[in-house]
């Protein structure tokens, strides 16, 4: 949240939380997520909100699997994978090579629109729920392509797109942002083949030091990654508004919310 070199993290957050608490505009809750709970500014933010008279609750968001490359080549990384995954990738890659298949990775504006159409076609027939903001992904990809950050991979079989993944590479980190495959071709394991292909590119060509699978504790992620960390959230409740007080009562129980309200009244001189 803050620059790690900030000399007075607690002081800065105290001022911020106090300004938020005293803001006259109507607000009920603040929900900050996802955050690194092991970062020094996480407990500092909790303390700042409490000192400002807000009811505060931290909560678990999700597990985050990631890979520490550690200077390895892709070959060294692949050799350390679970044997079942290695066998699947090796066997299915040979199977795909016997078919009329190809893998295309779009990393610039050239060919981007075709790659986006392929991704959207795959996504529409996958298990994924529809995007709430349909144009967001395409706009994000165009922005990333313009900056050289995009790695949009598509697997074609008989010129039909069957699997796609969106990776974003920046500052030495490859983030696996989106993936989907056509379930009618599930037996080909095209998604796994594409992951291996993009992983090789990220490690050997992009020279990343970390690959991040982002949100979720899906079982398959631990096979590809080396480490897991947690992301947490902080929710702060404005006890000076009816909705904020009601939300706090739902989260903490009516008794705890009532005690917190008493503390707020004392803090603000009896005004709520």
Task: Map each language-model feature to its residues.
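A short acidic, often aromatic-flanked loop/helix-cap motif at beta-alpha or helix-coil junctions
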Residues: 7-9, 109-113, 242
